[in-house]
Amino acid sequence: GFMLQDRGEMFSLDPNHMNSLIGGKRPFHTIIPAFITKNNKPLVSFGLMGGAMQPQGHAQIVINLIDFKMNLQEAGDAPRIRHAGSSQPTGEKMTDGGYLSLEKGISAEEILKLEKLGHKFQYDLGGFGGYQAIMLKDNVYIGASESRKDGHASGY
């Protein structure tokens, strides 16, 4: 026997649903590896597991690498923010703007800025994803594996 992934269960049989089952359509899912290029050449391949945290985490990793000039390991270890309560492809609708979960390490100054923008907060110890990456720099591969999950980067 064999098993297949269950992401197809995200389809809806309601023809008016945003994720309705239609021939040739792919289901909404969060299996999203990421790849960064620079000058049309490979730079970083990475992934961040964690359901709805995946696209948010991917964006934060790219911002950390490109905008904040963090190295591959720092980009994964940096504190993260997760938004919850958004409308979902399964049909749930956002009604109140949701909330931000803040990982330990976000500065009080940044929290105050977010608060002034009207964000609501929740503090969580988990659910911020798990990241691994490989970067090609100067013809040398560099690996990173963040501390939130099991794993490590090694080479030979």
Model-derived features: where do they sit?
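Proteins synthesized as precursors that undergo proteolytic processing into mature forms
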Residues: G1-D124
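In a subset of proteins, long, contiguous C-terminal domains/tails are tracked
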Residues: A108-Y156
